[in-house]
Design a protein with these regions (language model features):
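Active-site substrate-recognition segment that forms the wall
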Residues: 1-125
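C-terminal lid/capping helical subdomain adjacent to the catalytic/cofactor pocket in oxidative enzymes
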Residues: 121-171
């Protein structure tokens, strides 16, 4: 049997248990979802100079941006999210009715060289890694799955995966 580890930010803990260490770190992104904000968007709006994105969601408006590298169990600093909401009201949506909302963080698995780890686990037979995609995990997941499937089934992947090896240099 074969095992694929694709566990996001928690992959580091699983890998440590089988003797593999890679410099995987959580990259926390801050979000605020505001219901009844008075802002109606039909599509996401990037405020590049402010460093955040405004997205229409079922519950209303999501304002997201700012990231920090911190341990998984670090206490969130929601002041970061509050600053984004204030910027959105001041610079984009002066008519925003409400600025309070549901705050949360999303942890994304981040590698110091920004490349994911895709391929066999070094020194452990029948274990394959698909981790460290950062903010692009959901976007890159299907392609990564196809690449890992090709390797597991003995086929040549359509991409040279040398840069994505777990035993590469990260400096």
């Amino acid at each position: 049997s074969k095992l694929v580890i694709a566990a996001g930010c928690w992959a580091g803990r699983l890998l440590k248990d089988i003797g593999i260490r890679i410099p995987l770190a959580p990259l926390h992104g801050y979000h605020t979802d505001i219901a009844d904000s008075g802002v109606s968007l039909s599509r996401p709006v990037l405020y590049a100079s402010g460093g955040f994105v405004n997205t229409p969601v079922e519950s209303g408006l999501r304002i997201a941006g700012t990231v920090e590298i911190a341990p998984l169990d670090a206490k969130p600093n929601f002041r970061r999210a509050e600053i984004l909401v204030k910027k959105a009201k001041r610079n984009l949506f002066p008519g925003m009715k409400r600025t309070d909302g549901s705050q949360w963080i999303g942890a994304r698995p981040f590698m110091p060289d920004t490349l994911p780890v895709i391929g066999p686990a070094p020194g452990v037979e029948n274990v394959w890694l698909a981790v460290g995609h950062g903010q692009l995990g959901i976007t890159m997941g299907p392609t990564t799955g196809k690449l890992v499937n090709a390797m597991i089934t003995g086929r040549l992947p359509v991409v040279d995966l040398t840069p994505y090896r777990a035993d590469r240099s990260y400096v």
